Amino acid sequence: MDYNNFGNSASKKFQDDTLNRVRKEHEEALKKLREENFSSNTSELGNKKHYRAQERMSSPLHRLSPAGKSDDRKVKSPLDDKLRRQLREGNTRLPPPPFSSYGMPPTNRSNLDRIRRRTSSPVRTDKFASQNVIDDQRLEIKYLERIVYDQGTVIDNLTSRITRLESFILNSISDRGDKNFASLEHSRSFSGFPTNKTYGLQMGGLYENDMPYRRSSDNINKEGAREDRSSQIHIENESTEDILKILSSSFHN
């Protein structure tokens, strides 16, 4: 005799016998319950037996008998306390219900099988298709938000560069000691920037004593070729890129 596997085989045989006996008693109790409550020979169909509210809310195995028959314990509960304790100790499980494609899959299946069963269901196909559309739209919204953020960053950088150029021009003019230079308010803002600051500019360029402003004599000697070139800065009807080019050229000049 194999004493090593004797306990396992005996325990498995006991569990199988117990499970078969539970199924048989369960079927007999259900059959008897149907015969009592659904017999067409009585005029009190459905009103013959009364059940407690607690039994109506419990599982089917707990409400197999009426409340009045407390002596018939076999019909009241085919799974008695001893059998229930044996089932708990033996860790016996009733067979699971058949898998439905509309329910949750068993936990012992892999994720791939679960995904296949969910996607193969005709009811879930439209739901998953609409979910894919929603996900695509969310990705597109994120992409557009990133574009807007990048454009805002570019605009902020351009604004800071223009501000630095403006401050450099104003500081250079004030350092030359232009006593008669009047800081006139810009009649129009730069294109694309809602600013209305006081620039040392007019719509024809830099002016000094109603004449176009030119460089001092020390710069004229060094840049004789540029003496006759006008230093007017035209910013009317110019794009942001052109304004930056004009300001950059004035910065280098």
Curated annotation (Swiss-Prot):
Keyword vocabulary terms for this entry: Cytoplasm, Cytoskeleton, Nucleus, Phosphoprotein
Residues bearing the modification Phosphothreonine: T18, T240
InterPro entries documented for this protein: Spc29
One Gene Ontology term, aspect cellular component: nucleus
Subcellular location: Nucleus; Cytoplasm, Cytoskeleton, Microtubule organizing center, Spindle pole body
Polar residues compositional bias, start-end: 1-12
Gene Ontology BP terms: spindle pole body duplication
Region annotated Disordered, chain positions: 1-20, 31-123, 210-232
Chain intervals with Basic and acidic residues compositional bias: 69-91, 211-232
Gene Ontology terms for molecular function: structural constituent of cytoskeleton
Residues that bear Phosphoserine: S65
Post-translational modification: MPS1-mediated phosphorylation at Thr-240 is required for spindle pole body duplication.
Protein role: Component of the spindle pole body (SPB) required for the proper execution of spindle pole body (SPB) duplication. Links the central plaque component SPC42 to the inner plaque component SPC110.
Binding partners and assembly: Component of the SPC110 complex containing at least CMD1, SPC29, SPC42 and SCP110. Interacts with BBP1.
Family of this protein: Belongs to the SPC29 family.
Protein name according to UniProt: Spindle pole component 29
Species annotation: Saccharomyces cerevisiae (strain YJM789)
